[in-house]
Amino acid sequence: MRVAVISDTHLDEPTPWFRRVFDEHLAKADAIIHCGDISGDGMVRFLEASHPNVHMVCGNMCTGSARRHLAPRIAVTFEGFRVGASHGTCSQGSSAEYVLREFGPDFEVICYGHTHVFDWRKIDGRWVLNPGALQEGEGSFAYLDLVPGEEPKAVQVRV
């Protein structure tokens, strides 16, 4: 299973650039996880209408109904892998270590955003993934490949 993990789009509505990235890359994924800072209602509506398997969390910069209706963290299971996602906003210390504490030991992969910096590493037996910021000019996201019986794999995609 291939999951497109995105974060920190900071858009109220999808721009032509974002629509192109969506059509060329994200739409082909089996699922999409958005790790927060979507930012507005138009982006939430676009993602929900454009993909049948999208999961989103609220970030510190979300506005409107996105702030009111998106959870601060989610847990999903893909191909037997427990995957958690949150924005990763923390007042001190590392966002990766914060989300590890936030979710506890029962997750194989934890996705987060906030820092705008790609991160893929194993800490204490669990994988953490930050896809970077999917913004025009500094765009990146990650494909997370989950195959039963294999270690999770992630690759950064610059757009």
Predicted regions and their residues:
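Binuclear metal-dependent phosphoesterase catalytic core
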Residues: 6, 78-79, 105-107, 122, ...
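N-terminal active-site segment of His-dependent metallophosphoesterases
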Residues: 1-49, 53, 62-71
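P-loop/Walker A phosphate-binding loop and immediately adjacent motor/lid segment at beta-alpha junctions
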Residues: 3-4, 48-64, 77, 125-127, ...
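Helix-adjacent hinge/juxtasegments
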Residues: 53-92
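Pre-active-site segment of Zn-dependent metallo-hydrolases
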Residues: 14-24, 85-86, 90-104
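Residue-level detector of beta-strand structural context in well-folded domains
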Residues: 73-74, 118-119, 142
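Active-site neighborhood of phospho(di)ester-bond hydrolases with catalytic His/Asp-centered motifs
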Residues: 5-7, 31-37, 55-60, 84-87, ...
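Active-site environment of divalent metal-dependent phosphoester hydrolases
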Residues: 11-14, 39-42, 61-67, 90-95, ...
